Amino acid sequence: MQEKFMKLAVRQALIAKEKDEVPIGAVIVKDGNVVARAHNLMEKTQLATAHAEILAINKACKKLKSWRLDGAEIYITVEPCAMCAGAIVNARISKVYFGAYENKSGCAQSKYPVLTDNGLNHSTEFVGGVMQDVCANIIKKYFKEKRAKKS
């Protein structure tokens, strides 16, 4: 099941890449059904908060008519940053699955364990490395191409 939903998140990341956005995708699933999918839109919107996770959470909350996403799972192509990890915790998402680890800003495990911080009012389980090679290659290729264009 993890791979099935992560493939949908990968599809979202590829849509972002086509739009020249940082290729990160997110899918929220509840009771085995996809309730939201999104990809980064920071360049288009010029909003620092237009990360795939935040956009997917907003869509899921609207669809389910609740800010509490208890029992939901989120599939993300890259380990969430501090902002997104905080939003995941605040939304009460039950489990996070992510693909590529993000050593510079990942806040599930790599930099700071926001999702499992006992000092917060809620914590969220996570599984990292789901389709890791596929997810990591998408982001690496994107930034390699960006650097080549600057040269």
Task: Kindly give the residue locations of the regions a language model identified.
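Active-site phosphate/pyrophosphate-handling residues
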Residues: K4, N33, L55
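Small-residue (primarily alanine) positions within well-ordered alpha-helices
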Residues: A9, A13-A16, A26, A36, ...
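Short, basic and Ser/Thr-rich N-terminal targeting/leader segments
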Residues: D20-I24, D70
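Short beta->alpha transition motifs characteristic of CBS
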Residues: V35-M42, S123
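Helix-adjacent hinge/juxtasegments
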Residues: Q46, A50, I54-A91
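Zinc-dependent deaminase
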Residues: M1-K19, W67, P80-S151
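Residues that line or immediately flank small-molecule/substrate-binding pockets and catalytic motifs
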Residues: M42, I76, A100
